[in-house]
Amino acid sequence: MSFLKSFPPPGPTEGLRHQQPDTEAVLNGKGLGTGTLYIAESRLSWLDGSGLGFSLEYPTISLHAVSRDPNAYPQEHLYVMVNAKFGEESKELVADEEEDSDDDVEPISEFRFVPGDKSALEAMFTAMCECQALHPDPEDEDSDDYDGEEYDVEAHEQGQGDIPTFYTYEEGLSHLTAEGQATLERLEGMLSQSVSSQYNMAGVRTEDSIRDYEDGMEVDTTPTVAGQFEDADVDH
């Protein structure tokens, strides 16, 4: 296929974790031949006997797994999903994007690496996990960042910057607008009604239910209703 290129295999300088010879490469159901799979820290590469092959960058790999389902593929293999198109499909994708620029569907390619030695699959998968972990998704890292304003203690000690304002509960109430106070009262009423409804049986509030919620503590003293949840046999 046209995307196959000639390049030197990854070496020790690229953190080679696993090398698996006699491995067939399959792209979207089309066999590419048998060659050697190189799982390195820098990239995932496959080369056939003539020195032609391809490399996959870890940030483009969205999924990898060991597949043993004969319904998905007749042989056990290492499955790799990539967010990209290759070969003739990449040309078709470019043409489709020119016709419909509003299409947000992300391109997907499926690689299957079928080793001659099926016992090597676990080692291949482990090496993939270790190398993939070295290339975290930058979007995941950004989501962990704190978006709020940070109080600069050092700047405050130097007489710069504003001191953050903190309110007690009573002080906070005094800063509420009329609309805010009305909302707070409505929420408190809903909460009170919700607590009350939890301790009513058949719409009747009993004395036991009142005592069980004294001082804000729930105490389970409700008597068991005979026969309602019992599985024992009863003689008649």
From Swiss-Prot:
UniProt tissue specificity: Widely distributed but expressed more abundantly in nonpigmented ciliary epithelial cells than in pigmented ones.
UniProt keyword terms in alphabetical order: Acetylation, Cytoplasm, Cytoskeleton, mRNA processing, mRNA splicing, Nucleus, Phosphoprotein
One GO cellular component term: plasma membrane
Gene3D superfamilies assigned: Pleckstrin-homology domain (PH domain)/Phosphotyrosine-binding domain (PTB) (2.30.29.30)
Annotated positions of the Phosphothreonine modification: T222
Similarity field: Belongs to the pICln (TC 1.A.47) family.
Annotated protein name in UniProt: Methylosome subunit pICln
